[in-house]
Curated annotation (Swiss-Prot):
It comes from the Bacteria. It holds the Pfam family DUF5376. It comes from Pasteurella multocida (strain Pm70). This is Uncharacterized protein PM0491. InterPro entries: DUF5376.
Amino acid sequence: MQLVFSYIEHKSQVIPVCFWKENHQLHPLTGYLNDPMGGLNYFAFLDKVLSMLRDEDIQQGDISSNSWGVEIHGDQVYFCFLFAQEDTSLHFALSRAVLIDILVLWLAFRSQKPVAGYQEVLSFAEA
């Protein structure tokens, strides 16, 4: 699977986005990373999430955003869309270690000077 981090121009601003290279449809992971309802402090929130994921003492935890229900259960992280929890196509599970790696790279990408059209592609095995 390939996850694309990109900067796009939107309403005269250059903003970071991520999407699956193979499928641009709504997906729990990319929806969570992009969550537009997260507000201006969303990336600070994701940094806090990263700290929780790295804390091995936390075996159960709620790291939900405004749109996505996300729970830590041991070495796995489970996602669902809060506005359609019964829609299993919007459920997703990922290993905690892989989510840590993705968040580290997403936050680093997000902290760069934005350049419209710039992309980075991450490749990893399906979880």
